[in-house]
Curated annotation (Swiss-Prot):
Record-given protein name: Class B acid phosphatase
A molecular function (GO) term: acid phosphatase activity
Cellular localization per UniProt: Periplasm
Cofactor note: Binds 1 Mg(2+) ion per subunit.
This protein's record includes keyword Metal-binding: yes
Pfam families for the chain: Acid_phosphat_B
Chain's gene name: aphA
Cellular compartments per GO CC: outer membrane-bounded periplasmic space
Keywords annotated in UniProt: Hydrolase, Magnesium, Metal-binding, Periplasm, Signal
Principal location class: periplasm
Species this protein is from: Salmonella arizonae (strain ATCC BAA-731 / CDC346-86 / RSK2980)
EC number(s) recorded for this UniProt protein: 3.1.3.2
Amino acid sequence: MKKITLALSAVCLLFTLNHSANALVSSPSTLNPGTNVAKLAEQAPVHWVSVAQIENSLTGRPPMAVGFDIDDTVLFSSPGFWRGKKTYSPNSDDYLKNPAFWEKMNNGWDEFSIPKEVARQLIDMHVRRGDSIYFVTGRSQTKTETVTNTLADNFHIPAANMNPVIFAGDKPGQNTKIQWLQEKNIRIFYGDSDNDITAARDCGIRGIRILRAANSTYKPLPQAGAFGEEVIVNSEY
C-alpha cells in the first residue's frame, strides 16, 4: 500500500511539474514578448525616397529656388528650445510667445544646435546643381539674427546660393509660409511638419518630408507620409 501511495505521489508531482512547464512555454512574458517575421517585415505604406533619387529626378532641369524649414529639418535645435522652456516657462509652452526667448534663440543659441546629416546631403546636392537656397522658418522675427550665418557656415553654402533666413512667424489659423514660397518662386520645399507639407501643396509645388528625430522637444511627432508626400529615408538625423 505504501508503494502504491508513493507511486501515485510521484505521478502527481510529474503532472504538476509538466503542467507548470507547459504554462511557462505557452504564456509569453510581458518583459520579453518576442516577435515574428511578419511583424519584422511590416512597413507603413509610405512613399520613401533617397537623396540620390531626388537628385536623379532633377536631372536635366535648370537651377531653381528650393526651400528648407529649419528646426528639426536641417538643425536638431531642441537644446535651445529646451533651455528656453526651462528659463522662461518651465510649466508651459508660453516661452514660444516670449520675445526674450526668440532674441536668444535667433542670436547665438543655434551654436548648440546639431546640423542634420540629411540636410548636408541635400544642400550639397542643390549647391552642385546651382540652385538658390532659402530657409523659411516659423520662428518669430527679431531685430538681429545670426541664424543665416550659422546655417551658411554649418552647411558650407556659397554666398551665390545662400539667401537670408525668412522668419515667417506663427499666426493662429494661418500657414505663414505659403506667401514666402510663392513670393520667392520656390519649387521644392523640405520640412518635418504637416504645415511644411501643406504649405507646399497649397502652392502647387513639391513638398518633401524630412523625419523629425524621436527625441525632439517638439511633440507629438507628425505622421510622415500622411499626405502621400515623399519621405526621405534615414532622415531623422
